[in-house]
Design a protein with these regions (language model features):
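S-adenosylmethionine
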Residues: 1-313
Length: 313
């Protein structure tokens, strides 16, 4: 894989020479394969693991996630089609930690950019009983895939929608939790998807961080005061990650919350110079996964303020 020169220069300056060289080596390796069991259908602790993978490595931050030694032909597996497990990138399973730590009572949750359904099926598995998940996808054909995967998963407390983020603004203060896995430049997908490499450019990064702020501005009014916004991307740069978190803190008065993460997990923290608020970045040379980024923000208590971000995108 030949990485874009601008990406190399920026990421080397962000991580430092030694860390960048380790990342570059990792990006030339095969990505790990991981699945997450549906314990309502096929319990990981019972026959599931011995049937699909032995010996196995657990995904440390997921109660039902495991790594496989190789990528299987999942489309030929009736258990896959029955919703007994979901093929999901391991680092994105870290969403579970935020939900388990902060959501203790039944909640109404919106997964805003939900297709194909990995995080939605996962969230539905760990939300308290009595919760409702609204899984949304703006692209129509992808929303149909989302609906199919959630149907296979089998939990009844789910609604699938096909709306633009701005459509939710009138549901003022409606959601307890919003997960925004926003469209990004996809740097964390480089070793899984050659198209992500060919489509990357500094200009696309610029478009992405502006689009991300527009999405957050559109959806912010529908979050309850005191509610949680979980922000995630699959990219490394600070423009789409830390700088957007800082912007939400300064623009909306959001509180940036910590998520419990043992040092043994080797999750990388804040890379933005002069800032130390908690964020969680998975770098493939340090953790067994791809380039996932996550931060958790709490909306301040009090009156909902409508804010519209003006961008050129």
């Amino acid at each position: 894989m030949e990485l874009p020169a601008s990406f190399v220069d920026y990421t080397r300056s962000l991580l430092g020479e030694e860390e960048y060289e380790k990342l570059a080596v990792a990006l030339q390796q095969e990505p790990p394969v991981s699945i997450r069991f549906n314990n309502e259908k096929w319990k990981m602790q019972d026959e599931g693991l011995s049937a699909v993978h032995s010996p196995f490595d657990r995904v440390p931050w997921s109660s039902e996630g495991v790594y496989l030694d190789e990528r299987l032909t999942f489309t030929f597996d009736p258990l896959f089609h029955a919703g007994c497990f979901y093929v999901q990138e391991a680092s994105s399973m870290f969403v579970e930690q935020a939900l388990r730590q902060y959501i203790k009572e039944p909640a109404i949750m919106l997964d805003l950019c939900a297709a194909p359904g990995g995080k939605s099926t996962h969230a539905r598995s760990v939300l308290p009983a009595g919760s409702l998940l609204v899984a949304n996808e703006v692209i129509r054909n992808r929303s149909q895939i989302l609906a199919e995967n959630l149907t296979k998963w089998g939990h009844p407390g789910v609604v699938v929608t096909n709306n633009d983020p701005a459509d939710f603004a009138d549901l003022e203060g409606f959601f307890d939790v919003i997960l925004t896995d926003v469209p990004c430049s996809g740097e964390g997908m480089f070793r899984k998807d050659p198209v992500a490499v060919s489509e990357w450019s500094p200009e696309n990064v610029e478009i992405c961080w502006q689009r991300q702020r527009r999405i957050i501005s559109d959806i912010w009014p529908s979050l309850k005061p005191g509610g949680l916004l979980i922000y995630s991307t699959c990219t490394y740069n600070t423009q789409e990650d830390e700088e957007n978190i800082r912007w939400m803190r300064d623009e909306f008065g959001a509180e940036i919350l910590p998520v419990d993460a043992p040092a043994a997990w080797n999750i990388t923290g804040n890379l933005l110079a002069g800032e130390d608020f908690p964020v969680y970045r998975f770098l493939p040379h340090r953790t067994k996964g791809e380039g996932f980024f996550l931060a958790v923000l709490r909306k301040p208590e009090g009156e909902t303020v409508r804010i519209r971000y003006k961008s050129t995108v």
